[in-house]
Amino acid sequence: MLIAMDATRPNDLGDGKLGRRFYVICESDRSFRAISAGHGGGRDLKGIADFANGKRCAKNFGNAMDSRLTAGGAYVTGETKTSFKGYYRVSAKQDATLLRSFVQFDGEGETANARQRAIGGHPAELLSNVCLRKDLHSPYADGEGYVPFGKLVVYAGGRSDGCTSWSPSDAGQIIPMMKDKPTTLYIYP
């Protein structure tokens, strides 16, 4: 399997339509898929330099720590970790657990800082407006019995701050393909 992303292609086509700029090529079953992927954030250092990227096309790339930019170049996928992010409400009487998987990317040269920057691929979902809730029976509770509780936000097509992010449904198909199977990824440029 080969995966690639053209970060210069638009992520946002307007009118709520997402651009397809992430490609999965599987030679064994002769298949090709093009899906959307989140856009890099970058940073606007007021009065110094503006490295921010918009939703249309990325124009700034980098591998510096804290840059929130995607580095173009070759990567190999590493280990997959799944971590507890917190609980969120799905109905008046039901909460759900957000467990989010993350595929670590490793690189050399222009992508050498990927591991130190925690650059990888993950579902485009997070919790916002997080507070701590006492839940002594949760296996995820901290030493004092508290767990994060917030509102689920799916940001497919949103900022990824240097990582590659996919809709939760696409991530559910892509991440298992990479798990325990080092895969080559190329991000253009």
Task: Name the predicted role of every residue range.
Residues 1-161, 169-177, 181-189:
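Cell wall/extracellular polymer interaction/catalysis modules
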Residues 166:
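A conserved hydrophobic position in a structured secondary element of the catalytic/binding core
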